[in-house]
């Protein structure tokens, strides 16, 4: 059973022993812009998971589970795992000061959407919650903790929080130390490794579904505790696996709410580049990522307009069919798309 919490849909897909899809379900959601922040309600995440899983069929047959979700952003919790501030997603561009300072400090490009940039920006802003932080993680890491009790993260997702050393497959020790020195005069009751999830590579033991976790996912009661759950990953990692592009000198392009290319490198870059984000594959190999915040948002708005028009005419709407026909018809268009461009 694979579950992904994307920026526009929460998906659940079950495959058989021959890797063929047998059941699928989804739930549509969207980020809210509240008080200058792009955010999602975590309660809606659980509603979406339950809704998507209703269509999966007999969950009693599930033998393994994987969670993935949108990467980066800022989810900060206290010692009892109470959310300290609303989820700040990867869509926010509110950490320019922190991003610039950390890039200079590390000698490594730190994009605004990365978790470490959000954390340090909160420090620079003297936000009240900072001293109460006990855990920070990604959306996949949060869901995984809730269903297994394990505070872990797949190395690919972890590399979008703070830089990862591709040799050790965990957080870059030198950069962790530099950050700790940077905040040492603040008197916080934590250091960086105290609050980060443990980084795991693909295939490592990331825990098992708990009875409480099974209830959170499946209202039918068919999903049983004890199912192994793989290290939670980011949506970029699942994209690399799905396109069979995890080996060095391979790559893929993702076209979703955001667009990005992922190129698996055979050696380090010679220097940092502002437009290239260094992350990893789910097994820890270096990846050069070029990311644009907007891709299908304009298209989705047009498709929803078509959907409303069909509904006004009383015509049943299957969104998968609408997108399928639109994409296939687009192949007949001019190579330059009629001279139109959607600005990022």
Q: Model-derived features: where do they sit?
A:
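Short, conserved phosphate/pyrophosphate- and ester-handling motifs at nucleotide-, phospho-/glycolipid
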Residues: 41, 92, 235
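Active-site core segments that coordinate phosphate-bearing ligands/cofactors
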Residues: 1-2, 17, 96-153, 162-180, ...
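Short, acidic/turn-prone active-site loops that include or flank metal/cofactor-
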Residues: 27, 88-95, 158, 257-259
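N-terminal glycine/serine-rich phosphate-binding loop of ATP-dependent small-molecule kinases
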Residues: 1-86, 100, 104, 132, ...
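Short beta-strand-loop/turn "lid" adjacent to the catalytic site in phosphate-handling enzymes
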Residues: 54-90, 109-111, 140, 144-165, ...
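Short, basic and Ser/Thr-rich N-terminal targeting/leader segments
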Residues: 6-9, 61-63, 68-70, 115, ...
């Amino acid at each position: 059973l694979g579950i992904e919490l994307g920026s526009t849909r929460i998906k659940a897909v079950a495959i058989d022993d021959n890797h063929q899809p047998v059941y699928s379900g989804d739930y549509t959601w969207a980020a809210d812009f509240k008080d200058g922040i792009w955010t999602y309600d975590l309660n809606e995440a659980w509603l979406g998971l339950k809704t998507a899983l209703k269509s999966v069929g007999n969950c009693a047959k599930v033998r393994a589970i994987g969670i993935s979700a949108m990467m980066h952003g800022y989810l900060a919790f206290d010692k009892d795992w109470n959310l300290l501030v609303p989820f700040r997603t990867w869509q926010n561009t509110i950490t320019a000061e922190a991003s610039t300072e950390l890039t200079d400090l590390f000698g490594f490009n730190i994009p605004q959407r990365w978790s470490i940039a959000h954390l340090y920006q909160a420090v620079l802003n003297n936000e009240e919650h900072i001293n109460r932080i006990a855990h920070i993680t990604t959306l996949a890491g949060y869901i995984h903790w809730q269903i297994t009790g394990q505070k872990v993260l797949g190395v690919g997702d972890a590399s979008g929080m703070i830089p990862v050393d591709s040799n050790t497959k965990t957080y870059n020790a030198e950069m962790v130390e530099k950050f700790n020195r940077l905040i040492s005069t603040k008197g916080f009751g934590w250091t960086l490794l105290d609050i980060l999830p443990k980084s795991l590579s693909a295939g490592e033991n990331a825990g098992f579904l708990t009875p409480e976790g099974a209830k959170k996912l499946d209202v039918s009661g068919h999903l049983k505790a004890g199912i192994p759950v793989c290290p939670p990953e980011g949506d970029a990692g699942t994209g690399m696996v799905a396109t069979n592009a995890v080996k060095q000198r391979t790559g893929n392009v993702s076209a979703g709410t955001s667009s990005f290319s992922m190129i698996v490198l055979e050696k380090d870059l010679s220097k940092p580049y502002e437009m290239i984000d260094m992350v990893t594959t789910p097994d820890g190999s270096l990846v050069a990522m070029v990311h644009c915040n907007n891709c299908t948002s304009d298209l989705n708005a047009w498709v929803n307009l078509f959907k409303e028009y069909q509904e006004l005419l009383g015509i049943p709407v299957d969104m998968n069919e609408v997108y399928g026909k639109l994409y296939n018809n687009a192949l007949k268009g001019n190579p330059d798309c009629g001279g139109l461009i959607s600005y990022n």
